[in-house]
């Protein structure tokens, strides 16, 4: 092939990654490359890269079972967001409202795997059920929208039934979207921002963002922008 646009994101398997790397070494153009996919497949590694470069994000902690809930309370506090190491569309993401709720969630996880690892993240209260999704293609922001839950869920994903509307970018939003995708090596990226009185924080970055919602609510032709970018890269 002349080019490949991987659309598997965090679900990328070892076999798929091996094929990608083989084709890359044959000179095939990849949008995004295998290293960039690795950078965002692991949510903790994404946060480590952003933290190293002083990019604002919610306070984040990796823990393994058994978990000291008192330590969690002292260092992050409750409510707290509980995440699997990988995943998209809001899957594997839970909100523990208090210490007891968190301990019950841990007990449930123990039924499936007693030696699990999870990511714990600061809950940004002002952004409950709301976030900003920004699409970056080739180092340029091509669209942004505000997503909002319609059923009281703390997650705002359109794929989970949430609504959305276009939003005008400000300087900080644009900087965070461009800086994060640049640091992670992404040609195409979906950047999710949370916000409060202190400003914006990067919640997650996706290497294979869905764009049906962006096209529906903003009328921006994301697929067309991607095709134009690929054509320019090939030429």
Q: Residue spans of the language-model regions?
A:
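Rossmann-like NAD(P)H-binding beta-loop-alpha module
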Residues: 56-77
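Short glycine-rich anion-binding loops that position phosphate/pyrophosphate groups of nucleotides
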Residues: 9-11, 86-87, 208
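ATP-grasp fold ATP-binding core
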Residues: 50-51, 73-91, 114-127
